[in-house]
């Protein structure tokens, strides 16, 4: 009896120590934050995977060849996303090219956007002057798009698009207003909820929902 009573506290103490050790070990390491100083006239290359980059200064060309990186950056003349699975938050950008897959970009405005990497997500709170999408399963969400060219199988959502040309197939486009719409691809779905749209449909099996202007 005596030896049994002495063993119980030892077992309880061992269980408590094991629990404490498990709590003390972190479940997952946090990605390091790496400050990067941009300089005018030089190309800034971000090549390390799984790193959080904090860019500062005046950026010219920024090239992201890393995978699964997080980038916070000021305005730049050109952004190239070659890696995969990156997340970029930027100030206004002039030219953007996305060739890697599964990247995400958030910015106030873009002058030229070219996307060929599959599964890209681009969110622009303001104006996109020119958007060319030739990928698959990519998404562009913007306030206003001046010229949109869809050559792959992607999706575009905007409040206003002035000129939209769809040469690819299986695209999904949702616009509040659209001035001109030209389709030569097949099986595209386009919805325009307000205003009048000049339409030319030379494709096959396209689903178009173009609602007339509301009378006052």
Language model features by range: what are they?
Residues 1-30:
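Secretory targeting and sorting signals
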Residues 22-23, 28-216:
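Extended beta-solenoid/beta-helix repeat architectures
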């Amino acid at each position: 009896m005596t030896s049994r009573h002495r063993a119980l506290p030892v077992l309880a103490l061992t269980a408590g120590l094991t629990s404490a050790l498990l709590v003390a070990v972190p479940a997952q390491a946090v990605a390091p934050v790496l400050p990067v100083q941009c300089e005018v006239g030089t190309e800034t290359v971000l090549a390390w995977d799984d790193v959080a980059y904090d860019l500062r200064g005046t950026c010219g060309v920024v090239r992201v060849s890393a995978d699964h990186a997080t980038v916070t950056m000021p305005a730049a003349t050109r952004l190239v996303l070659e890696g995969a699975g990156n997340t970029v938050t930027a100030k206004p950008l002039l030219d953007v090219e996305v060739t890697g897959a599964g990247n995400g970009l958030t910015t106030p405005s873009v002058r030229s956007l070219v996307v060929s990497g599959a599964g890209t997500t681009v969110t622009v709170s303001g104006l996109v002057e020119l958007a060319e999408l030739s990928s698959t399963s990519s998404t562009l969400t913007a306030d206003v798009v001046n010229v949109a060219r869809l050559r792959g199988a992607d999706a575009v959502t905007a409040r206003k698009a002035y000129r939209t040309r769809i040469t690819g197939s299986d695209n999904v486009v949702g616009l509040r207003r659209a001035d001109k719409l030209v389709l030569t691809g097949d099986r595209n779905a386009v919805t325009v909820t307000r205003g009048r749209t000049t339409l030319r449909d030379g494709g096959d099996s396209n689903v178009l929902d173009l609602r007339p202007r509301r009378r006052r």
